[in-house]
């Protein structure tokens, strides 16, 4: 069947904001697909609500709509654009669910829009638990005994019949949302009640738990002519029972016999054929380690997180091929873009091993529930490639950026045996490190396999690493052993530790004895055919396949795994920087370790090195490539943290230099710079111990804002009210030291705003000023930002522009910088300066049409703003109002408090744009899934300091028809001021307390603030987590609630009696 000529215009749905379970892999898939469809000559219309994506750039599609991914908005765009077809399989669960809604609402039929790729029947059969069960029965594929339930009672009677443990899986949800393993009736009641609420079709599957089986995944493709192939097989290190997104994964499978592999492979191909999927599909299976029996766990009839991993692991571009299949091309028509000679029908073969490790947010959320289960918790992932399992596993550990350079966590050697075993049995995010510690203590791999059901093969690899450590201790400075340790992935740092020397000495020793890495190509065909991909990984072998080109090159360091505080925004900037390097006539080389992103798509750069972003690995590439220099500005804190070591090693850093980076990051130098430039900042001091901290706080006066120096995303940042709180902060939150002092600032309660500026050293371009809706005290990444500013006087804006120019020139900034200001009584103070690209770059680039990262890169490569046609100063404002709103993943993270403060908690962002502030706010709230009806009940439970302000909001809510409920203290205050409210209990287990009313669906929103004292308020935390569980809008900052109120008021007609 040939390419379809009866369709001209295709709409692609993106996946919206990044949340746990749906991250940057969909930006990668969507970008690939849009470009592939344009390549085939189709007109592409893209809809996505997330501005921090490459796919929402104007060059990627013919028309780009950054609008909420809701039925109402997408229907309007469909009516306006009238596309011939819709491709929903690249937008994750969001895209699939929207396609189902559009179909059920009759919109697709009304407009004659055809669904491409996966038929609706297949989405239904794969996602609807009942239909899936029927299909598997017809195919004779075994699935665990299960029952579809729509009530809690139904679940309990089925569990009693088959016995516990059972697994609960809500239908049509993402990343295991609302699911879990239940070992008793009480747990089952809780999980099913919640799961039924979260499932859009109020349906849960209760199934026999097969926890402990091997979890195997196959990434399969099929075309309309029924050609099908397996792109990649993957094996989870962790057995069934832990969500695959939270598991360590190896590709290809490592422990299956040929018979087992063929058995599961055939089952996967039978399933994709039966579902008639045209495109990519992911099949998850459970294999009994002691027999040939297996079960089908689930099928994702779309591009997924696993397909991004499979694409990067094999070099086979799944999303690109899936998009072309959707328009009628066949696998045996298309050339494999990697080899250029073989066809896409040719199954990839790997002559290396790939390890994926999940990146968890528990460095940010120390109170979070770290136990792993069927609900996903990781925010991102890293991938490493090597010739041996030990090698790729250790490289992946280094890539995580959690302060480890080996499979070893500091401090575990002091943990008791009892605690060690408990940690190993109940898997947490750091189980790998506990397993390694147990092996160092002499536990046998058989004992550990008995406790964990992890295959002996994998545990034996961990044991081999431990044996090598012991050998190294016994034989210091043995060159043969050094070579062997490097072949198995040991870092110079780890070898230095075992030989009691420093990493630099090991590096010198290696170079003296020519123990150097070579770079191998990822070519999809195990070197069987000649391949053209510039995609490399390091290993300690003989033949080097990466040849330095004749052209002068520039290396850009990526930002590593996605985590809270360092998201896809930095990858966006990296990709744009590469475009500018190429446009300036240089060869662009990317180094990065994240398989989900666009930057690690090998077609983006001239060369891609898939490596950990550590000094050792970066230096190895620099020594081979001999670049003009390295750009660090776009890789977030990851890259900036390498500046000092690289500068000392004589590597040319392009853009802002180390001493100027230090002047922005080092407290004393920064204060001096501000003083010299005549720019005010909140009074502040530094402290290296508790006594100094108390002395500093007394001098400045409470409340103070405390934080460690050199961090991203406000990690361990707090507003402290009194001396007791400060003492506890110094004891628990930070390890202060002379090298890493704690910063203590006066906390100014004012309006916050921020600026991204681009400087060539002489002139400074300020694309725009963003005003935050939440006042100072809420992290800038968690605040709603408005552009252009709505409430800043001309005088304040002029002052911001003046200070920005002075800072950029005074700090010798070349390229990007981000400055945050706080404004109190028309006085402007600088809070912080980051001499690098920030997370607002994509948003501002979109709303001003300035490709900021490209402009900054051109300046770094010696052009001027004038050369590029930009004026000095503030760029003319847009006529529309644009809002950047944060999106959170609290529903996935039990025990994490959703109260907003100076520590960043959001995982993603959306954008809302319109002619007025109210309309833009409405879109931003809709896009971030904060939907409030036009009437209902709102609960106020407010701290004393905020009551007067909350009263004004309560009066306005009452005026538009909301019923106001309040907890005791708040209700009494309202009554004194003449406002009637209905009294509601906080938590007390009665039928009229907040959690009970939330469960009954009788509350539409909650406003809950905590006083400046931020006392450990257990009640408040229970109320907040109940609201999150029930999906009820929760506001912990009055400013956000006031913004929502403006929207509701703007949608309400006034009704007055005459």
Curated annotation (Swiss-Prot):
- Ranges for region Oligomerization domain: 402-546
Q: In which pathway does it act?
A: Amino-acid biosynthesis; L-arginine biosynthesis; carbamoyl phosphate from bicarbonate: step 1/1; Pyrimidine metabolism; UMP biosynthesis via de novo pathway; (S)-dihydroorotate from bicarbonate: step 1/3
Give the EC number.
6.3.4.16, 6.3.5.5
| Residue positions binding Mg(2+) 2 | 298, 300
Cell membrane among the record's keywords?
Answer: no
Q: Which GO terms describe its cellular component?
A: cytoplasm
Q: List ligand-binding residues for Mn(2+) 4.
A: 832, 834
Q: Which residues are listed for Mg(2+) 1 binding in this entry?
A: 284, 298
> Where on this chain does Mg(2+) 4 bind?
832, 834
Q: Any idea which positions bind ATP 2?
A: 707, 746, 748, 752, 777-780, 820, 832
Q: What are the binding positions for Mn(2+) 3 in this chain?
A: 820, 832
Protein residues bound to ATP 1: 129, 169, 175-176, 208, 210, 215, 241-243, 284, 298
**Segments for region (Carboxyphosphate synthetic domain):** 1-401
> For this chain's UniProt record, which GO biological process terms are given?
'de novo' UMP biosynthetic process; glutamine metabolic process; L-arginine biosynthetic process
Report the top EC class in one word.
ligase
The record's annotation in NCBIfam families points to: CPSaseII_lrg, PRK05294.1, PRK12815.1
Subunit composition and interactions: Composed of two chains; the small (or glutamine) chain promotes the hydrolysis of glutamine to ammonia, which is used by the large (or ammonia) chain to synthesize carbamoyl phosphate. Tetramer of heterodimers (alpha,beta)4.
Q: What does this protein do?
A: Large subunit of the glutamine-dependent carbamoyl phosphate synthetase (CPSase). CPSase catalyzes the formation of carbamoyl phosphate from the ammonia moiety of glutamine, carbonate, and phosphate donated by ATP, constituting the first step of 2 biosynthetic pathways, one leading to arginine and/or urea and the other to pyrimidine nucleotides.
Q: What is this protein called?
A: Carbamoyl phosphate synthase large chain
The lineage, from the top, is: Bacteria, Bacillati, Bacillota, Bacilli, Lactobacillales
